[in-house]
Amino acid sequence: MTVTSILHHLSGANAFYNQPNYIIQTQSDLEKKSPLPVTYFVKTEHKITKTAKAIFSTIFFPILAYQWLHVKFAQKLVLPASNPNLERNKQLHAQRVSINLKSDLKYKRLSIQVDDYIIDAMIIGKPSTFDNGRWTLFSNGNSSAYEWTVGDLADRVNGPIDHFKSNALIFNYPGVSVSSGPPHRPSMAKVYRVLSTFLADKKYGLAAREIIGFGHSLGGGVQGEGLNSYVLNDKVGYVFIKSRTFSDLSTASTKMVKSYLSQKTKWTDSRIDLICKIARSLIKVINWNIRSVESSQNLQAPEIILQTANVESYEMLTDSSKLIDDGTLAAEATLAKALLSNPKGLRKNQMIIGIPEKHNESLSDLPFIAKQVEKMFAAQKVDQQGS
């Protein structure tokens, strides 16, 4: 697992942003339309296993067809940002090269290789925070790319890292923008795990002492999938935030299909229900039913769930009565609804916050969230000292 150590280039005289050619070099990196040389490499599959899978898939055509359907379904519906589109890629490139490199924030683009996937990523921070050990890992929604979050939607990253006193690691899923490989559910989870390892790696990674995972919409689901089989580092503090995330993808999708067909067609309820049942079954059959509830309930770390509610300001929720449709997700299809409806209640280190913002609106009260994050980190330190 090695390529280049980046840790010693984050602060001091050797810091990448203190070099006289920082702007020229970074601008050159941003202009590249292909991945940069790999900074961090993790191989999770043995070569023999990978070869056997490839041969098996080739021999048995139904498996190859199934994999093709899995990818195409993702490109069209689950992760449309991965659907090949030359015009969108031009826009993303324009967003990337237009980053203001003279601002207080410093940027470094890099590549993380996970088996055969090369993931395009970027670290963002300030000279005053790069050595504080706190990092936020952002996972995007299904139509987004990291280029938007450093461009037109910069407040979605800059706001949190400012209020969280954190640095950021942002990335694109497989198949999105410059990241290689097709969108594949297990690989997306695997990528999230490797990025989490990269953050905590003291030798070749970023040596994070505190990690905030911030997943929006699909990103919350990917976060949960990645953490399902991930062993958290007991030397690192964690807080995971899921913003406007679904309970499971089949429920969320069928609710959206039903709402759309009810508004746009004159079909009978029974016909619409039949189509919804088919859609739900298809999502499950082709293995795209990302389930956020189970991963959230099993998570061994503090967690904050943000969900649209009938509130004027941010508010802790203890029941689901104030949850409302957020413009994309029906209230009934949200992770918050599922957790608040659980007779066992929430975990002791889990909270749900009702917010007035709709699904894709920027968060308006980051100080409120930052306060909860600080409390959770403080509680973890007390627990670690006592154990």
Where are these regions (language model features)?
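Short, surface-exposed "cap/lid" segments of acyl-processing enzymes
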Residues: 115-163, 173-178
